[in-house]
Amino acid sequence: MSRFTRRKFLQASGAGLAGILATHQAPSFAQQSTVHWIKWNDFVPASDELLRKQMLPEAMKAIGAKITLETVNGNDLQPRVTSAIQSGSGPDVFMLFNNHPHIYGASAVDVSDVAEAIGKAQGGYYNVAKANTQDGKKTLSVPWAVIGAMTSYRKSWFEEVGYNEFPKTWQEYHDAGKKLKAKGRPLGQTLGHTFGDAPTFSYPYLWSWGGKEVDEKGKVVLDSKETLESVKFMQAFWKDSFDEGGLAWDDTNNNRAFLSGTISATLNGASIYIETLRKPDQYKTEKDRPMKEDIRHSPLPRGPKGQFGFHLFQSHMVMQYSKNQKAAKEFLKWIHTPANYEKWFVSQKGYSTPPAAMWEKHKMWDEDPVMAPFKIAGKLGLSPGYAGPPNRKSAEVLTKYIVTDMYAKAVQGMSPQEAVKWAAGEVQKIYSGA
């Protein structure tokens, strides 16, 4: 594929957004507005610093409104949006994860006008972006980014146990993990109630065995032979190969464990690798070499029914209770203008993948081959609720961690049959409206 220079890239992508900010004059409606934007604490801190020190001052000048950025732990976003909706006041713009917009759609401003212009100008949104933000009646939120979930692993350690490439199947991964754990280098994975690494592991694992919550028509089919086999395998896999303390981990514990050299692999975004790039003298291998040289990335292994991915998706919802809806929309238009969004995207160094296809051509992807697997994460990921339609019910199942808990219960001693029966019953309650 031919690569674009930055000038050509921005010229091509900006054409479709001409007129979004056609003049340099701030919109008159926004002169006294203050837009309160709440998002997660980025796992690439440099990006939040860029927003605060450079991009938001530029945005305020461009749209004529004050913008207040609040950052919180990603696990706190759902409680905050729920509380704001109940009280009828709070941030004007909420960052949400995955299919969560379907839960709060009744309280969302229709942002079709903003999102459609951005998607059209930037090569079209990936299917996962459309599925998570559109309910068939309106666009609930504006797609922001896809955070690729890949396995970060220590290349040399896997080579020591006979794997010159990352294991292709779950059976191979089990074998490698068992050997690594015997050497004091277990695999690391959370099965806790944390928004990122737990579901992005448990859902693709389930799908790869042929299990799924619902079929194409939305009928609950979780209680199946395929699901049961996945749980049986997980029981032995967990005991033999993983750091069993991972049951209580959040989305930061595995980063710390990997960087301290106590685990050999973990499903994660690229934040571990990016941290070793940022501090090469701090993170060293046992041979006193920069750890960054020994890190590689790979998709999750293949199961009996294929290889799947679930990548953390982010979007921004403008709230109906907001008195600054127009200014909030103008801000989202501004920040998604390619010349502006590119600054943030480049600061992420590949940790976040834009939700539209045009960005696959960006030159940044050629700069570091270790990051190459993340380039097409948005193209390959599925949404929770597969193979059924994305909706409020699938979002509720995700929010309640039912799929993750099914595996967590089994590795803590519940029989596979009981764990599957419990999970299927919980999913059925949600889909039947019980």
Regions found by a protein language model. Give the residues of each.
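N-terminal secretory signal peptides and thylakoid transit peptides that target proteins
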Residues: 1-17
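Extracytoplasmic "Venus flytrap"/periplasmic binding protein-like
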Residues: 32, 55-125, 156-168, 255-257, ...
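Conserved C-terminal helix/tail region of periplasmic/extracytoplasmic solute-binding proteins
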Residues: 34, 66, 83, 159, ...
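Hinge/lid segment of periplasmic solute-binding proteins
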Residues: 97-150, 168, 174, 201, ...
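Short, solvent-exposed loop/beta-turn-alpha elements that line the ligand-binding surface or hinge
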Residues: 112-128, 193, 209-231, 278-292, ...
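Long, aromatic- and glycine/proline-rich binding clefts that accommodate carbohydrate-like moieties
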Residues: 123-132, 290-299, 346-404
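Extracytoplasmic/periplasmic solute-binding protein
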Residues: 136-144, 149, 174-220, 226, ...
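Glycine-centered hinge/linker elements that transmit conformational signals in sensory
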Residues: 176-179, 218-247, 296, 300
